[in-house]
UniProtKB/Swiss-Prot annotation:
One of its GO terms (molecular function) is phospholipase activator activity. Component of chylomicrons, very low-density lipoproteins (VLDL), low-density lipoproteins (LDL), and high-density lipoproteins (HDL) in plasma. Plays an important role in lipoprotein metabolism as an activator of lipoprotein lipase. Proapolipoprotein C-II is synthesized as a sialic acid containing glycoprotein which is subsequently desialylated prior to its proteolytic processing. Proapolipoprotein C-II, the major form found in plasma undergoes proteolytic cleavage of its N-terminal hexapeptide to generate the mature form apolipoprotein C-II, which occurs as the minor form in plasma. The gene is APOC2. GO terms for biological process: lipid catabolic process; lipid transport; positive regulation of phospholipid catabolic process. InterPro entries: Apo-CII, ApoC-II_dom_sf. Gene3D superfamilies: Apolipoprotein C-II (1.10.1440.10). It is found in: Secreted. This is Apolipoprotein C-II. Residues 66-74 are annotated as: Lipid binding. Residues 1-22 form the signal peptide. The keyword NAD does not apply. Residues 78-100 are annotated as: Lipoprotein lipase cofactor.
Length: 100
């Protein structure tokens, strides 16, 4: 695989991981310190904006049509496979519930 593709994939996963952590941290409200919560939210928002801008810049600099076509092809094949497996799984559950 191309190293640019792996780098872009790593950055996307890193950004998504940071977003999940930020969402979990924001759910844990501490009513005793609203000023601290505001500072944390502002800091996380700032980091998120910086990471998002860096990922977009990297994507624009390393954009390759062949990689884009491969990604679209992988997405279409994987979504078709998932649809097939979802139909099979649904059929198995219905058969199990009906008791045939």
């Amino acid at each position: 695989m191309d190293s640019r593709f792996l780098l872009a994939l790593f950055l996307v996963l890193l950004v998504l991981g940071c977003e999940v952590q930020a969402a979990q941290q924001l759910q844990q409200d501490d009513p005793g310190s609203p000023a601290l919560l505001g500072k944390v939210q502002e800091s996380i928002s700032s980091y998120w904006d910086t990471a998002k801008a860096a990922a977009q810049d990297l994507y624009q600099r390393t954009y390759l049509t062949s990689v884009d076509e491969k990604l679209r092809d992988m997405y279409s094949k994987s979504s078709a496979a998932m649809t097939t497996y979802a139909i099979i799984f649904t059929d198995q559950i219905l058969t199990l519930l009906k008791g045939e």
